From Swiss-Prot:
Extracellular topology ranges: 22-261
Cited InterPro entries: Neur_chan_lig-bd, Neur_chan_lig-bd_sf, Neur_channel, Neuro-gated_channel_TM_sf, Neuro_actylchol_rec, Neurotrans-gated_channel_TM, Neurotransmitter_ion_chnl_CS, Nicotinic_acetylcholine_rcpt
Organism the protein comes from: Drosophila melanogaster
Gene for this chain: nAChRalpha2
Protein name: Acetylcholine receptor subunit alpha-like 2
Record membrane topology: Multi-pass membrane protein
Role: After binding acetylcholine, the AChR responds by an extensive change in conformation that affects all subunits and leads to opening of an ion-conducting channel across the plasma membrane.
Lineage of the species this protein comes from: Eukaryota, Metazoa, Ecdysozoa, Arthropoda, Hexapoda
Residue intervals passing through the bilayer: 262-285, 293-311, 327-346, 527-545
Tissues expressing the protein: CNS in embryos.
Length: 576
């Protein structure tokens, strides 16, 4: 570019800033003119507003005659059910409170005011009925958001302010968490009696019928995730107070709610039922594991934790016990009983014959009869005949190496006895008797065996607290010695053989009875397993089945009457 021609083009932003600096007063003046033009665009409404409120006194009741009654129509539009606090017994709702009444000072001819039929005025500038929530639980009895009121040329005034009310609600916890609650909101005039202000529901058709079935408008209701609305009736009452002779009318808006139980079923019911059935498995756990009592105590502590959790949810009332609380008390009783029974079973399992002798009826009932009813297989060695076992024990002993050697020696010294006599002799040896044994002398081959057995008789006779087996044998041996002269070594050997036989017999009986006690404990475990399982099933269905809502098929009306709910469910169906 040639020298002297170095002009630059202004940037767009800089150009706008330059125009704004020089034209700012002009722009502000233009905006003011537009606003003035807008205000002057409806001079009829301004003139009407001045005419209606210039001489209006908002403190005076709007009647032409002092004896007249102002009829106030009251309605409630529910927007949201925010919360129902069971602990504090407070219902929190987001509502629109609809008011309608006639004010003769607000009548005009629309033709005189350019066809204006409605006028919106601040509610602070007109008379308002002092409608309050009687059962308020938060301190705010009246509407705090002062929205504009709508004036009709006929004199009708419509005022619909929004409000969040916290009303007291008496909670019935008998069937928690399958419960239904009925709450109400009582509205009435705080100052004026029934001769000055008469209340009527906005949907009430005649004066005789004071009850309206659909008393709350649910068209703008947003469905709750915890409660279903079953009914919203409204009813007009008149109450006489001690202070005044005139009646005070009020309107009750009732809300019947049914709890959606999915949350509590998943987080409370199923864990409680599962933990209660663990008490049945205590009796399936073997007694030798050493964990039966620990499992019982763990289950008891778990149920105590759930009981404390419920006490934090429900109100502190002594009028009724909640359904879930009944079930927890029932299961805690079962678990506590299982602890006691488990201790008894463990005591039976570890009993010893030296301290506890099993009675015949215990053996007959718990070993022979009850296992068949419980479909248990009884080991064959537990069904033995103890008397036959004692008789045959000598024959078993004679078949051992030592017993056979003793019998051979007796046969040699008896001069070749017959087989029948030998069998009789074996039986007598097994039974502990020595009478009638025709033994003449002992040989040198038996002397070593006798010497081996001759020493420890005195020490073994009192082993394990068993009675001496030698009592009664001295007389029989003396009789034998009187008839036949036996060597002293053979007599001593017979004494020791009899002791060993009786000691082994008592030891086997000791072990067998120890096994019997263990099997009795096992049978008791199986018996109480079935009893506790049946009790748990019956208790679960009986206690939890008391709730009437489980059999109530009433459909919720909030989904049917709410336009918002219909839109939500329609969108959900389209997405699916």
């Amino acid at each position: 570019m040639a020298p002297g021609c170095c002009t630059t083009r202004p940037r767009p932003i800089a150009l706008l800033a330059h125009i704004w600096r020089h034209c700012k007063p002009l722009c502000l003046l233009l905006v003011l003119l537009l606003l003035c033009e807008t205000v002057q665009a409806n001079p009829d409404a301004k003139r009407l507003y001045d005419d209606l409120l210039s001489n209006y006194n908002r403190l005076i009741r709007p009647v032409s005659n002092n004896t007249d009654t102002v009829l106030v129509k009251l309605g409630l539009r529910l927007s949201q059910l925010i919360d129902l606090n069971l602990k504090d017994q407070i219902l929190t709702t987001n509502v629109w409170l609809e008011h309608e009444w006639q004010d003769h000072k607000f009548k005009w001819d629309p033709s005189e005011y350019g066809g204006v039929t409605e006028l919106y005025v601040p509610s602070e500038h007109i008379w308002l009925p002092d409608i309050v929530l009687y059962n308020n639980a938060d301190g705010e009895y009246v509407v705090t958001t002062m929205t504009k009121a709508i004036l009709h040329y006929t004199g009708k005034v419509v005022w619909t302010p929004p409000a969040i009310f916290k009303s007291s609600c008496e909670i019935d916890v008998r069937y928690f968490p399958f419960d239904q609650q009925t709450c109400f909101m009582k509205f009435g005039s705080w100052t004026y009696d029934g001769d000055q202000i008469d209340l009527k529901h906005i949907s009430q058709k005649n004066d005789k019928d004071n009850k309206v079935e659909i008393g709350i408008d649910l068209r703008e209701y947003y469905p709750s995730v915890e409660w279903d609305i079953l009914g919203v009736p409204a009813e007009r009452h008149e109450k006489y107070y001690p202070c005044c002779a005139e009646p005070y009318p009020d309107i009750f808006f009732n809300i019947t709610l049914r709890r959606k139980t999915l949350f509590y079923t998943v987080n409370l019911i199923i864990p409680c039922v599962g933990i209660s059935y663990l008490s049945v498995l205590v009796f399936y756990l073997p007694a030798d594991s050493g964990e039966k009592i620990a499992l019982c105590i763990s289950i008891l502590l778990s149920q105590t934790m759930f009981f404390l959790l419920i006490s934090e949810i429900i109100p502190s009332t002594s009028l009724a016990l909640p359904l879930l609380g009944k079930y927890l008390l029932f299961t805690m009783l079962l678990v506590g009983l299982s602890v006691v029974i488990t201790i008894i079973i463990l005591n039976i399992h570890y009993r010893k014959p030296s301290t506890h002798k099993m009675r015949p009826w215990i053996r007959s009932f718990f070993i022979k009869r009850l296992p068949k009813l419980l479909l248990m297989r009884v080991p064959k060695d537990l069904l033995r005949d103890l008397a036959a076992n004692k008789i045959n024990y000598g024959l078993k002993f004679s078949k051992t190496k030592f017993g056979q050697a003793l019998m051979d020696e007796m046969q040699m010294n008896s001069g070749g006895s017959s087989p029948d006599s030998l069998r009789r002799m074996q039986g007598r040896v097994g039974a502990g008797g020595c009478n009638g044994m025709h033994v003449t002398t002992a040989t040198n081959r038996f002397s070593g065996l006798v010497g081996a057995l001759g020493g420890g008789l005195s020490t073994l006779s009192g082993y394990n607290g068993l009675p001496s087996v030698l009592s009664g044998l001295d007389d029989s041996l003396s009789d034998v010695a009187a008839r036949k002269k036996y060597p002293f070594e053979l007599e001593k050997a017979i004494h020791n053989v009899m002791f060993i036989q009786h000691h082994m017999q008592r030891q086997d009986e000791f072990n067998a009875e120890d096994q019997d006690w263990g099997f009795v404990a096992m049978v008791m475990d199986r018996l109480f397993l079935w009893l506790f399982m049946i009790a748990s099933l019956v208790g679960t269905f009986v206690i939890l089945g008391e709730a009437p809502s489980l059999y109530d098929d009433t459909k919720a009306i909030d989904v049917q009457l709410s336009d918002v709910a219909k839109q939500i469910y329609n969108l959900t169906e389209k997405k699916n």
